[in-house]
Amino acid sequence: MSSYILFGLENPLLDYYVGGETATLEKYGLKSNDAVLASESQMGIYKEPCVSYSAGGAAQNSCRAAQYVLPPNSTVFAGCVGQDKFADMLLESNEKAGLRSEFSVDPTTPTGVCAVVLSNNNKNRSLCTNLGAANNYKLKDLQQPNVWKFVEEAKVIYVGGFHLTVSPESMLCLAQHANENNKPYIMNLSAPFLSQFFKEQMDSVIPYCDYVIGNEAEILSYGENHGIKSTDVQEIALALSSVEKVNKKRTRVVVITQGADATIVAKDGKVTTYKPNRVPSEEIVDTNGAGDAFAGGFIAALSQGQGIDYAVTLGHWLGQECIKVSGTTLPLPKKQFPLP
C-alpha cells in the first residue's frame, strides 16, 4: 500500500557544472545568483568542459530533499524528459533518493540541461537552462490516470514557478484540484525573470496559492513588476500574502529566504523572522540547491501536518546540510533531523 502524500510538478533537468567561474559568467553574459533560460548566444555553454553532473531541476531537487526526511514512498514528481542517457541518469538519481518519477517521454527532444557556474569560492551560483524535453509537458500528460491517481492521493501539491514557461494549464489544473479538496497548494517563485516576462501566467496561479516560497531577488522582482513601490522585502512579502485568494479557508503564507540571513514569513498582515544557524565558511562546498533543499524541508513538514515554525526549521536544516556537499544532494548515509 503506497502512501504518496506529496506531489510535485516542474522541469526534470540534469545539472551540468561548468568551470571558469567569473570568466565563464562574463563570456556568456550571466550574473551570479541568477537563473535564466538560455538564449541562442548562450548555447555554447553546454559545450564547455563539464566538471560534474548531478540531477537538478528546482522542484525535482525539492522533492528529493522532502523524500530525504519523509517515510519511504511519500513523494512523486512529474515532468517531461527525452529518451536518452540524461533521462536515465535522472531516473536513477531519483530512484536512489526514493523519489518516484512519473515522467512523460518525448523521444524527439533531448532531456533538459541546466548549466551551473559557481563563483566566489562556490558561495555564488548562476544557472542557465536549456529546457529541452521539459518544455514539452502537456496537460494531457498530467491527466493520464496513472499520474492523476497520485494527485488525488497527495495531501500537498507543490509546483515550481519555472513550469509557468511550460504548462501553466497543468499548474492551474493542480491548483483547482487542491482548492476543491482543500489541500495546501504551494508555488515557488523560482527566478526573478518569471515575474517580469511571465507575469500574466504567474498572476493566474497566485490566487490559488496557499503558500508562496521564494528568495530575496525573486520577491524584489515580484514587487517591481506588480507596481509595489516599496523595495523592502518584508513589505512586498506582505503585499503578496494579501493578494485575493480563491480558497478562503486558509490565508496565504509567503516565505522568503535570504541565504545566511533571516527567513521572512508574511501571514495575516504580520511578519515573523527566523534566523538560520550559520554554516562555517570552511564547511561550505556548494551553495547550488540550498533554496531547493529549504523548500523541500518546508513542504515535507506541511505534508505531515506540521506548523510553520517546524517547517522553516526543517527547511533551514536541509539547506545547511545541502551546502556541505557537492551538487544538489544531501549527505549519505542519511542524517536524522534533530527534532526540537
Curated annotation (Swiss-Prot):
It comes from the Eukaryota. Belongs to the carbohydrate kinase PfkB family. Pfam families: PfkB (PF00294). It catalyses: adenosine + ATP = AMP + ADP + H(+). This is Adenosine kinase. Pathway: Purine metabolism; AMP biosynthesis via salvage pathway; AMP from adenosine: step 1/1. The lineage of its organism: Eukaryota, Fungi, Dikarya, Ascomycota, Taphrinomycotina. The keyword Magnesium applies. Keywords: ATP-binding, Kinase, Magnesium, Nucleotide-binding, Purine salvage, Transferase. InterPro entries: Adenokinase, Carboh/pur_kinase_PfkB_CS, PfkB_dom, Ribokinase-like.
